[in-house]
């Protein structure tokens, strides 16, 4: 494979599975497993554009919520059920996350997203990786 092909076919990291909270459980009381994927640059930029006037925290919430595979916070049935339960209109993954999570759970979700996407890597860390 030449260099050109390597740039066209990057080896993306697999989705991660994690337990967000022991308050979301199955019928046996076992904590539910959540799954997160990487967003494409186009997805991330669109989410950022749509939330730019809402502040950094809202952008991060929207990114983290949109990256979830399980549960799918864009599922129309889930959004309708959350709207009915919360007596407010829930239209987006970010609104769904805020409707169903506690503040501690929301912070943990943002932390998982931040860590998974390696958003905290410094330029020095990236340069060190390139040298190895």
Predicted regions and their residues:
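Low-complexity intrinsically disordered segments
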Residues: 1-13, 123-132
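Short, surface-exposed, charged amphipathic helix/loop patches that serve as local interaction elements
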Residues: 27-132
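Short acidic, Pro/Gly- and aromatic-enriched capping/linker segments at domain boundaries
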Residues: 8-25
